[in-house]
Amino acid sequence: MSTVGSTVSSTPSRRFKHRNVNTFLTYSRCPLEPEAVGLHIWSLIAHWTPVYVLSVRETHEDGGYHIHVLAQSAKPVYTTDSGFFDIDGFHPNIQSAKSANKVRAYAMKNPVTYWERGTFIPRKTSFLGDSTEPNSKKQSKDDIVRDIIEHSTNKQEYLSMIQKALPYEWATKLQYFEYSANKLFPDIQEIYTSPFPQSTPALLDPTAINTWLENNLYQQNSNSNRKLSLYILGPTRTGKSSWARSLGRHNYWQNNVDWSSYDEDAEYNIIDDIPFKYCPCWKQLIGCQKDYIVNPKYGKRKKVASKSIPTIVLANEDEDWLRDMTPAQQDYFNANCETYMLEPGERFFSLPAVSATAHPSSEV
């Protein structure tokens, strides 16, 4: 049985994320046999050690069939591909089943036929332990956190469970739990959409910018030479940020550099309105270096930049990086970065054409 769309692409499917040991799927108007669907799902989640799969056919009001599937695994099934569970062109509604008991009861409320394999794991009455039972064994903190990791479905739920189960640790070590939450449930990078209509930059020397783009951004597979970064200095309201952000997938930093959300799949970086003295690892960024160590705030030191990508630095005249550098720093900067200084009237967008029939303003 074929699986449709099982590869991650650069389409909006990047925004999807599923992570849970209990997965609830509903295939609407699906004529496939429950056994065939169940066997396919069992095979599909083999990497996460399936322990139970229930596949139920239900009659819909219009006379067609739905297929409900409850899949339980020893390890959380994780995917960022919205088409991961597609079967022969049928795309399911995908949910994290917080209560496996309720989901199973719902799926079995009026079955036409069903198929199941493995041993159903009822939801624990409390995976934090029941201290009211005299012979109950108190869970260790490691067991508690392990259960929270397996059962939480998002960052907020994870932190809420930690707060409830380990209030003292939550109060005294919150920054570490926030760090682990970001690692377990990383933010999905949103595709930037410019709020302005597409237009041609009104530059005195567009060839300089176009040449930099061609040599350093558009030739992604060229590894013969290390790329050069780009420094753009000019007034505000000239469209620098919108233009730079519209070029492709990127890491964007404004006011400060936040390494915790570094996107390894980004094609370039943008440093927007950050003074030179407050930019960490500026040599690594400007020099398009790879595999360097950074120190995220409240997080552990880590290695980033598995590939060489250029950085676009955007600055206004009052925060000119070159003015704040030593001669040695300027030498390194100029050797690794193209510079474009906007002249009066230059901008990274074109003004709309004025109609010949437009009436002149009566304002004085």
From Swiss-Prot:
A divalent metal cation binds at E58, H66, H68, N110. A motif (RCR-3) lies at residues 106-109. Its EC number is 2.7.7.-, 3.1.21.-. It is found in: Host nucleus. ATP binds at G234, P235, T236, R237, T238, G239, K240, S241. The active site is at Y106. Gene3D superfamilies: 3.40.1310.20. A motif (Nuclear localization signal) lies at residues 297-308. There are 3 rolling circle replication (RCR) motifs. RCR-2 is probably involved in metal coordination. RCR-3 is required for phosphodiester bond cleavage for initiation of RCR. Homooligomer. Rep binds to repeated DNA motifs (iterons). Forms the O-complex, which is a Rep-DNA complex involved in the initiation of RCR. Part of the C- and V-complexes which are RepA-Rep-DNA complexes involved in the c-sense and v-sense transcription. Essential for the replication of viral ssDNA. The closed circular ssDNA genome is first converted to a superhelical dsDNA. Rep binds a specific region at the genome origin of replication. It introduces an endonucleolytic nick within the conserved sequence 5'-TAATATTAC-3' in the intergenic region of the genome present in all geminiviruses, thereby initiating the rolling circle replication (RCR). Following cleavage, binds covalently to the 5'-phosphate of DNA as a tyrosyl ester. The cleavage gives rise to a free 3'-OH that serves as a primer for the cellular DNA polymerase. This is Replication-associated protein. It comes from Sugarcane streak virus (isolate South Africa).
